[in-house]
Amino acid sequence: MNLWKYYDGDLKYPDLNKHSHEKEISKTNTKWAFEYVSKHGKDEDLEPAIAKSTKGSYYYAKYILNAQPFPLGEKIIAKSAEYSYLYAAEILKKSFKLGEKAIATNAQYSFFYAKNILKKPFPLGEKAIATDAQYSYMYANGILNGPFPLGEKAIATSAEFSYLYAHDVLKGAFKLGEKAIATDYHYACYYAIYVIKTSFELGEPAIAKDALHSLRYTDIILKKDFYLDGKLIYKYKG
């Protein structure tokens, strides 16, 4: 075993008088312990050393124990949102209660924990989900199957997800998101056509920047000449 590659300037040398062979040396350091079991397979004597590392504990469960639980490492795995989710998804294949507090600090892992593991809402993670426009929309549309008021402030920062939230979830106007929608000619036009089904004056300056969307807005919504600030943008042809 090449111990030198783990030396980082701070690592103390093991006392070779106390460690007569490779396995005994490996007990002193998580990296060495994991390297040993990678070569020799599961070893309960080295598990306490491995259980000091979040990543090491997860990889031990996945690759050494062949995707079987590693109870000794669960306490440290539970400190990480990423590895708690992965442990639930790939090892336990069910909820990991001990790790839910950590998962709930991260929007992405909270959403996927709800979607892939719980297959239902994850209230503990909603505060984190609500910080992200995309995951707030996806949580509303795919998990709650209805409005997610806590996430609407984040959703309203995005033209894309404000439009999708209005169209797919609310199935009607999303006033809070109209300012963002109005910055994008595509979503402003489609918001008028497919959501509110009437003129969307706030979005007209953006729509006017694109010929194709001006045509659609004129023909489908206005059904009259499209003027903006006294300037003809598109002539209605009937």
Regions found by a protein language model. Give the residues of each.
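Alpha-helical scaffold segments
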Residues: 2-238
